[in-house]
Amino acid sequence: MSLCVFALIASEFMPVSLLTPMAAELQVSEGMVGQGIAISGLFAVLTSLSVSTLAGSMNRRTLLLGLTTLMAVSGALVALAPGYMVFMTGRALIGVVIGGFWSMSAATAMRLVPASQVPRALAIFNGGNALATVVAAPLGSYLGSVIGWRGAFFCLVPVALLALAWQWVSLPAMKAERPTGAAGNVFTIFTAFKSAPVAWGMAACGSFFMGQFVLFTYIRPFLETVTGIGAATVSLVLLVIGVAGFAGTLLIGRFLGTGLYRTLVVIPALMAAIAAALLPAGAWFAAVVVLLGMWGLLGTSAPVGWWSWIAKAMPHDAEAGGGLMVAVVQTSIAVGSTLGGVLFDSAGSRGTFMVAAAVLAVSSVLAFVTARITSRTT
């Protein structure tokens, strides 16, 4: 499962490191290529809200194997895309995999291991996420410069097939535990918003991911045009972001146990400051590396905090909570990358980064409100 997460995260965000060459070959703007992340987010939302209903009584092992197969198909479609529409079709398919897999991840972990080992299982799942964050962007950028962006995407296909073979051998049969529609009904899932802490928390979570991807989706064009570095150096900067993010994932657990809400307030506030600081420091390479390293440290570790929050906010309905979280996160990523694309094409990096800073600041405020409301209702 961790290998599958690695391939999934690498597939989802590979375009971030390859925007420039992809845009040139597909003969569209960098903003339009960035919409490949937006469309994957849209289809992830639709899938997360409906996967349990559509799967019905299907054995969950079969469903997971099918999703992993679809991930390999998506990678091949993108790598072989003759034009923009086929590229977007491949990105839509990876969105289906994202929504289906992540909405089932917590429930799957609960069925694979004893209750006492569920947190450890989820941590192992996230290990694949952290590893992909470390290597996907810089490796994608490097491979893109050596074998082209198509070759970089095609390299994900054997990884997905390896994950499929591993799951085929290791996953036990997992019968559907609920009647059709019990867990996947859209209206059932959205009743969670009747809880004020959940509603405010989801708003804070959504604005965090929106602000993050307004900026991060277009970091390569910023590095090339403002900082003035080439593809090889871009790969090194992305590696710094990834390594810092991996370190952040390892470190954040020390803060969540005693200061969950404080952590969720501070992280977006610091990232807003970083987004604003990148503008005056953009031409200074050393400063950009330090700032983006801090961005990676904070941004990659934050999802661990938000998944810990949803487990605390909805402890008795992991599947509904997981589906709702995926829907909110992926909608926010789609909106953020779309907004970032529009801003980058019309206002350049300055407008893009300032909006990202503002949205992240809003996330910090909403997280603070969530903490206050939660303390009053418990």
List each model region and its residues.
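Cytoplasmic helix-loop-helix junction between adjacent transmembrane helices
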Residues: 90-130
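C-terminal transmembrane helical hairpin of 12-TM major facilitator-type secondary transporters
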Residues: 262-305
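Helix-to-loop junctions at the C-terminal end of transmembrane segments
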Residues: 47-59, 248-260, 344-345
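Helix-breaking motifs and short loop linkers at transmembrane-helix boundaries and internal kinks
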Residues: 27, 59, 80-86, 228, ...
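A late C-terminal transmembrane helix in Major Facilitator Superfamily
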Residues: 313-349, 356
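Paired small-residue
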Residues: 74, 85-94, 286-294
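Conserved MFS/SLC helix-loop-helix module at the cytosolic interface between two early adjacent transmembrane helices
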Residues: 46-82
